[in-house]
Amino acid sequence: MIKAKDYIDIVLPNYNSSRYLKQTINSVIMQTYKKWQLIIIDDCSDNKTLNLLKKFHKHKKIKIYYQKKNYGAGFCRNLAMKKSKSPYIAFIDSDDIWNKNKLEKQINFMKKNHYSFSYTYYKTFGLKKRFITPPLRFDYKSFIKNTSIGTSTIMVERKKLKNRKFTNSKICEDYYFKCKLLKRVNFAFCL
């Protein structure tokens, strides 16, 4: 029997992301760590994206919720976090692809070191292919000087999120969330 304390809820906001969405979802499904649930909040997407999402309706580990109006990524992430019941929350965006052992490595790193907030290195793709190497440790002051924590690399203990939410602004909603979270946990650590 899988213990609830080992579960990770994965938050995925989606809006008209048909180009990479299938790859994004499959990168979660293919994780070597199997104790997860994917919570997708669709933000009033076009028919092409909705048809793609329909292919995942029957997957027992994927929950999809549909908005009737476009509210933005911050609103969608907050709604998914509200629906989350697991002790850990990870974030992925609809145009990001995880390595297959991302969750396994990250949760083991957090548990072994008793960390409540972690992030990873990441690689961009598309026009500008870069390997992003963030510092090994961030506190609030160092983060506002160097904002290199990718949202799709974050895993956090749910209990540390108390009243920490994404703003509903159309830009920088993830930056403000990370700032508020770092004030609460003091430090975040890089795997």
Feature annotation, model-predicted:
Residues Q67-S84:
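Glycine-rich, basic loop-to-helix element that forms the pyrophosphate-binding segment
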Residues I89:
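Short aromatic/hydrophobic "clamp" motif used to bind/position activated sugar donors
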Residues D42-N51, K69, D93:
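A conserved acidic beta->alpha catalytic loop
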Residues P135-L191:
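Conserved nucleotide-sugar donor-binding catalytic segment
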